[in-house]
Amino acid sequence: MNIAIIGSGLTGSLAAISLAKAGCRVDLYERLSDEELVNRDRTYAITHSSRKILEKLGIWSNLSKDLVPFQYLNVIDYELNKKFVFLTNDLPIPDQKYSAVGWIAEHKFIMLSILSFISNLENINKIPTSVIPNTNNYDLIVAADGSSSNTKKKLKTPSFHFKYDQMCITAKVLLRGVKSNEAFEILNSEGPFAVLPLGGDLFQVICSQSILKGTYNMNLSKSLFLDYLSTILPYGIEPDTIIDAPESFPIDFCLNYLFFSGKYIYLGETAHKIHPVGGQGLNLCWRDVDCLSNLFSIPLLKNNHSLIPLIYSISRSIDVLSISILTDSLVRYSRSNISIFYLPRFLVFFILKNSSLLRKYILNLMTNGF
């Protein structure tokens, strides 16, 4: 089967590998150079669902060397002054042997590993443009060109979209008073923020807050920004040095009504974009890839490939919709400071702190989706 993939970011490139291993001939269209693809300052939380996908494709053993595992995921509600912790014991038994609740990955390391893997696959042909000269040459076309997809605009695919009244600020910071194997997801009235380990004393701080306050904080000097971080980090954790200048980006939500259009299949952020809280974004995108490659391995569908886009769209709808609603609800939960919500929030934290069964269930949803 001849497949075209538009976009060779993390999702498009992984799709190319996955479909090539399923026996397809893949043309991978990308206007950016490999250097431009690699040089992005982003950090991701990798769950066991992504680990399983990477293992299946034979990428995990090489890639895992550059990942930072964490054994503790601390969830804190500042408004309640309550906390509970996800541990490796809360994972399904087969996943516990990896001794990690999850892993933190820097974009450049994942991208380099995946691009290196692609270079060794003969049935992937990289083409340095984002325009397909003749779409009739392909049985199916995968659009993985991101949330601002030109493909989606050209096909006029409808979607549900809104902008959060927030922006995200991220910075690499040296911290004191924190273990190198723990991560934090913190809920407060400004918006959720995360503290992710990058090895040793280096951490990535990712905070979402109102556009007005975020714009003000982005204009602070490094010393004043450190002072600001000291006011929002958990008690006992102190910022020492900012490694890179803080960066910011807007936060929006987008969900296609359908994940296909004719023989075009929408993958990753071309189909859905969610709030970064909980670190679900990349894992959700890679589960798209896994679902699609599983369909290509079904003999009946190989001979009826025109059915694949519709079946893919239906197959992914529950997981994507559920995670989208869950992350959006978590943002709204975090920012609600109305007294009527105090008791429900208190009960949620009390139950999660004391019920290992519920923690296992929630962590499984965060790890493997729906």
Predicted regions and their residues:
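Glycine-rich FAD cofactor-binding loop and adjacent beta-loop-alpha segment at the N-terminus
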Residues: I3-A4, S8-Y72
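Conserved N-terminal helical subregion
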Residues: K52-E55, N62, D66-K154, F160-T170
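Active-site flanking residues adjacent to catalytic metal/cofactor-binding acidic residues
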Residues: I6, Y29, A144, G268-E269, ...
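Conserved FAD-binding catalytic core of PHBH/FMO-like flavoproteins
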Residues: L54, A144-P246
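C-terminal helical "tail/cap" subdomain of flavin- and related membrane-associated enzymes
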Residues: N294-F370
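FAD/FMN-dependent oxidoreductases across multiple families
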Residues: M218-K302
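Short gly/ser/thr-rich secondary-structure transition/capping motifs
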Residues: N123-T129, I186, A245-C254
